[in-house]
């Protein structure tokens, strides 16, 4: 039953990982003729927590097709087991230490938030260090914000920040829960206080996680939206505009076409008169960019190149697909720019990938490659194609929609991102191509020369 796999909720996954780090074993000395020992609190939790995994393995061995009713029934069985094991553990006298911790986790599995909160608060009275304490604090925030016990949630966040281990993702999650709770109660000064910390955590996550681009962009955008709402509600709209402008600048540095598009939309909504081109006018203000190389399974009418090899040229990277109507709308301009500027240093790379179909027909990679060659010839596209066999290029450049175009100057800096094929977008892109071509060629620095070599 392979299709029954489901994503673990983010916070639950963090707790599972913290448990893995904090796992311990208690040595026991067997006694001759002793009674069977009762299951430990940890084993009771692991029995319930691992129930779904065990059942899904059984279903896979039986080659059962996905059945939503079976999935629902299996989840209910896990819930019942968690309740049963929690009752077994709770019936024991004078629980303390890790017993309280695992009891809290069992109540969490059993969807008993009040009991989970109570157990974790008792556990934290005795234990304030280590992975288990940090996991307990995340649950206190979850159920504190659900039950409007914001004092407990605030205290747990403060204590989480004061102890280790901690992660940017956990900080993002618990601060977000608090900000959201204050937003529901219209306490917008508190929303701003915690949303600023959410954005800080999202940026820390972005710095440390260069590969999980979609999660990175989602965290950055959601935190910015939360903070923007707080600023607007507290009559600090200029701060909201500046915050999105800064995030838009970050989207160029990452780079991320999706984040760039979303921040541009938000800026225009907040301030219709905002000059979205100003970011690209001051070259010295642009962040240093380390661009990922384009990963290719095949090159069409273009020898393999690395971006570092193209320093000294203006590079236009166009993400497109043969089935994309708006992408085709840009072809005449791409052909025109190639004709006008190729000899002046413009290189265009059309980046696509194998989609497994074309013109409503399923195609093998070999057949699709033949189709792309014929498509290129039929549409008289004079620039090279880059064909990927995975989503790696889209992930690296944060591309969620096409066409998306990145324009890179002769020093290797992203100077413009275009996300769409409207007349305004195409006109702006064309103006930037002309501007970069006409910029004087700067001597290559020693560091740039060594990087290229």
Question: In which residue ranges do the predicted regions lie?
Answer:
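Thiol/disulfide oxidoreductase modules built on the thioredoxin-like
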Residues: 377-383, 387-434
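Short active-site neighborhood of thiol/selenol oxidoreductases, capturing the structured segment around
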Residues: 304-328, 334, 348-349
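N-proximal helix/coil linker or "cap" segments that precede and/or mark the start of modular domains
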Residues: 249-297, 308-311, 441-453
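Structural microenvironment flanking redox-active thiols in thiol-disulfide oxidoreductases
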Residues: 174, 329-379, 386-395, 431
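Helix-turn-helix repeat elements of alpha-solenoid scaffolds
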Residues: 68-85, 108-119, 145-158, 188-204
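N-terminal leader/linker segments that initiate helical-solenoid repeat arrays
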Residues: 24-98
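Residue at a conserved register position within TPR or TPR-like alpha-solenoid repeats
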Residues: 107, 143-144, 182, 224, ...
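Short solvent-exposed coil/turn linkers within tandem alpha-helical repeat scaffolds
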Residues: 88-98, 110, 124-135, 147, ...
């Amino acid at each position: 039953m392979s299709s029954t796999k489901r994503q673990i909720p983010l916070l639950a996954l963090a707790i599972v990982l913290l448990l893995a780090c904090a796992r311990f074993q208690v040595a026991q000395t067997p006694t001759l003729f002793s009674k069977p020992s009762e299951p430990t609190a940890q084993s009771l939790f692991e029995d319930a927590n691992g129930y779904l995994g065990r059942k899904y393995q059984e279903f896979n061995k039986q080659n059962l097709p996905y059945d939503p009713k079976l999935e629902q029934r299996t989840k209910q069985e896990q819930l019942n087991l968690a309740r049963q094991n929690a009752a077994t553990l709770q019936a024991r006298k004078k629980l303390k230490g890790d017993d309280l911790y695992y009891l809290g986790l069992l109540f969490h599995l059993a969807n008993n938030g009040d009991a989970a909160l109570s157990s974790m608060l008792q556990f934290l009275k005795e234990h304030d260090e280590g992975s288990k304490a940090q996991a307990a604090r995340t649950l206190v925030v979850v159920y504190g914000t659900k039950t409007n016990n914001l004092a407990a949630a605030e205290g747990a966040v403060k204590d989480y920040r004061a102890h280790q281990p901690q992660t940017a993702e956990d900080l993002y999650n618990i601060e977000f829960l608090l900000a959201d709770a204050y937003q529901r109660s219209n306490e917008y000064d508190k929303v701003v206080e915690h949303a600023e910390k959410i954005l800080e955590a999202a940026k820390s996550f972005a710095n440390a996680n260069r590969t999980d681009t979609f999660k990175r962009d989602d965290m950055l955008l959601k935190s910015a939206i939360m903070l923007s709402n707080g600023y607007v509600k507290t009559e600090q709209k200029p701060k909201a505009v500046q915050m999105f402008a800064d995030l838009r600048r970050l989207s160029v540095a990452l780079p991320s076409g999706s984040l760039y598009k979303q921040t541009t939309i938000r800026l225009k909504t907040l301030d219709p008169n905002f000059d979205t081109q100003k970011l690209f006018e001051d070259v010295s203000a642009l962040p240093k960019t380390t661009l990922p190389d384009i990963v290719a399974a095949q090159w069409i009418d273009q020898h393999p190149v690395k971006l570092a090899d193209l320093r000294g040229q203006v590079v236009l990277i166009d993400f497109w697909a043969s089935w994309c109507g708006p992408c085709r709308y840009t072809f005449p301009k791409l052909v025109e720019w190639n004709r006008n500027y190729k000899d002046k240093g413009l290189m265009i790379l059309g980046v696509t990938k194998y989609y497994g179909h074309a013109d409503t027909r399923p195609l093998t990679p070999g057949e699709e490659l033949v189709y792309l060659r014929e498509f290129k010839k039929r549409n008289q596209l004079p620039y090279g194609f880059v064909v990927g066999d995975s989503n790696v290029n889209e992930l690296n450049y944060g591309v969620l929609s096409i066409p998306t175009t990145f324009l890179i100057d002769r020093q290797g800096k992203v100077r413009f991102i275009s996300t769409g094929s409207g007349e305004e977008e195409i006109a702006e892109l064309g103006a930037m191509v002309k501007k970069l071509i006409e910029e004087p060629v700067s001597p290559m620095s020693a560091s740039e020369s060594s990087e290229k070599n």
